[in-house]
């Protein structure tokens, strides 16, 4: 079993979880092919982490299965947006932590 972690990525964890659920339990090669044609930013980021997990184990992509793809919430980046009459509104930009584990197919 090998794993890869990407932390503090500027990405909404809610949107990333939608992609992560789709590839869990899939063959890594199929998952990478599927992620390549998804139009989301999260798909591109998760594809890189999956490829890294496969490479960390020294495996070939067609011989491993994604056992777990977990997305956790990171800290929010706090920003301010100027508003009318000298006021300001707080903007919260979410970050995410991505954990991917792959295991050799048996």
Curated annotation (Swiss-Prot):
Q: What is this protein called?
A: Large ribosomal subunit protein uL22
One Pfam family, short name = Ribosomal_L22
* Keyword Ribonucleoprotein included in the entry's annotation: yes
Q: Which GO terms describe its biological process?
A: translation
- What GO annotations for molecular function exist for this entry? rRNA binding; structural constituent of ribosome
Tell me which UniProt keywords the record has, alphabetically. Ribonucleoprotein, Ribosomal protein, RNA-binding, rRNA-binding
Q: Say which family it is in.
A: Belongs to the universal ribosomal protein uL22 family.
The answer on whether this UniProt entry bears the keyword Ribosomal protein reads yes
The highest taxon in the source lineage is: Bacteria
Matching InterPro entries: Ribosomal_uL22, Ribosomal_uL22_bac/chlpt-type, Ribosomal_uL22_bac/org-type, Ribosomal_uL22_sf
Q: GO CC annotation: what is one?
A: cytosolic large ribosomal subunit
PANTHER family, per database record? CHLOROPLAST 50S RIBOSOMAL PROTEIN L22-RELATED, LARGE RIBOSOMAL SUBUNIT PROTEIN UL22M
| Subunit structure, as described in the record | Part of the 50S ribosomal subunit.
Main function: This protein binds specifically to 23S rRNA; its binding is stimulated by other ribosomal proteins, e.g. L4, L17, and L20. It is important during the early stages of 50S assembly. It makes multiple contacts with different domains of the 23S rRNA in the assembled 50S subunit and ribosome.
